[in-house]
Amino acid sequence: MNKFLKWAVLPTMILGLFTVTSCSSDDDDSGQKNVTMKVGDTYTIKSGSNWSVDNEYVAEITGSTIKATLVGEATVSNGTSSFKLTVDPKTILWKDPYMKWNASKSQVKTAMSKYELLTENDDQLIYNGKDKADYYGYQFQNGKLYSSMVFTSYLEDEFNDFLKERFILIGSNDETLTIYFTDYSMKYIVIAMFTEIEDVPYCIVGYGDASEVNSMAQTMKSEFINLKPYIAESIKNGDIKVGNANVREVKAKILETLK
């Protein structure tokens, strides 16, 4: 199945923009074994036949062999038996931002209590990041969370793997240097927006409800403008590595590996 082409059924609003190495199991209520895998791993079902999976993005089944292909959850069944399949990522660059849409600002602050709050206004929270996340950003409408963002200068091959393990490619826009994704459940949209500061290619990864895709893109641009002085200062201080790559080349390379 061509998973990219299958997205022709997406709403026009979105399209217009653009051998197991580790496996665990536990019993569910029906006595079946639930399975947890990592992307790229395989697992052989010990008994039964005619197995199928209800989400072909998360896993593929050939005979009795499951291959995990995308982070998410699915149900594997053969008409008489079933079990839950959970696929976890292999590549972890940062902790996922808080993504409970419509949460209050106080709820986000509680969830981010271990991170340093950098700046705050009525519609926005920005935190210093950890690991490969330089910053986290949260945007609010009428006091409710509608978009979460991660700002990163880490655009090595691992970044490609990070995206590919978690998200389904929808499309891209060369003019705005953006790549659009969704998750396995198709409940939220992910936008990778590329830019350049002090000759350093930079990316903002924005997460939000699929219905907010248009306003998300504008919000990401706004948050980037607010953070630009902090990012530039980090580059001058040597906290962010300076590279020679052109941002358009970086974006094109990442997009090619995702197809």
What residue ranges belong to the model's regions?
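Coil-to-beta-strand transition motifs
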Residues: N142-S147, M186, E196-V200
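Short Gly/Thr-rich strand-loop-strand
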Residues: E165-I189
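Short helix/turn-capping signatures at newly exposed starts of structured segments
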Residues: S25-T42, I61, T69-V71, S77-I170, ...
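Bacterial Sec-dependent N-terminal signal peptides
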Residues: M1-T42
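Short, hydrophobic/proline-enriched secondary-structure or compact coil segments at domain edges
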Residues: D199-S215
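Short, exposed beta-strand-loop hairpins at the edges of beta-sheets
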Residues: S77, A192-E198
